[in-house]
Amino acid sequence: FKNIKNFKFSDKFADSNEMLNLLINFYKYGFVVIQDVPTNNNFLVKFGNMIGSVKRTNFGEYFNVKSKPNPNDLAYTALSLSPHTDNPYRNPFPPCIQILHCIENDVKGGHSTLVDGFTVTEDLKKLNQDYYNILTSTKVRFKFSDKDTILESWAELIHLDEKGNFQNVRFSPRLDYVPQMKREKLEIYYNARKCLSDLYNSDEYRIEFRLMPGDLMMMDNHRLLHGRTSFDPNEGNRFLQGCYLDFDSTEGKLLHLRRKFNL
């Protein structure tokens, strides 16, 4: 994590060898940071469409991340955000890729945090097989609701494919509802969930860094959990814009660039 290369944006970035290296690193590590991206309003949509197709949601084609009154999500406050994945309530899957573009950031605090859910899952399996088994087999209800929208989905906190391989994590404690189950199983489940949360919040797995204006972070929302430290909105401005993409379009871009550069 700590040796991830930062990339530099340029006018010829879209079909460049730099873009190819960016996508290779993204699929290897789960996130990349691109510097010197123009801070024009909603430029991240243009960037997103360079590498795939921006996915429209109930939040729009893109969304603003800044403190505001009466928010429908904690992201729109100055509070700290513990590690989580976005949109776990979408069916069948949450958006695969999230882009966050820093427009302004002159506050104290407000650092970005990332946790590799795949690494945590592997370590949880070694630490306690029973916890791993119950978290990969118990579906919980995820729900989002505001005055305009209700979204629900049932899924495991850790989803495996039919061969038992890691597929994705869905973790957002404010949005999940545990189903009814026998008391003994429920106790194991809550202990397992707490253990998982403790791992996600451990300094051993978390990296913390500051996004500066012009920095754009692209992360795998199926693998990476993200968060932020708290900040004081009275000290300055912290303004990011975000959007989502799906894997098929970025994988197509990667294949196109591999063919172009004979790799």
Model-inferred region functions:
Residues 1-31, 36-37, 41-263:
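Active-site environment of non-heme Fe oxygenases that use a 2-His-1-carboxylate facial triad
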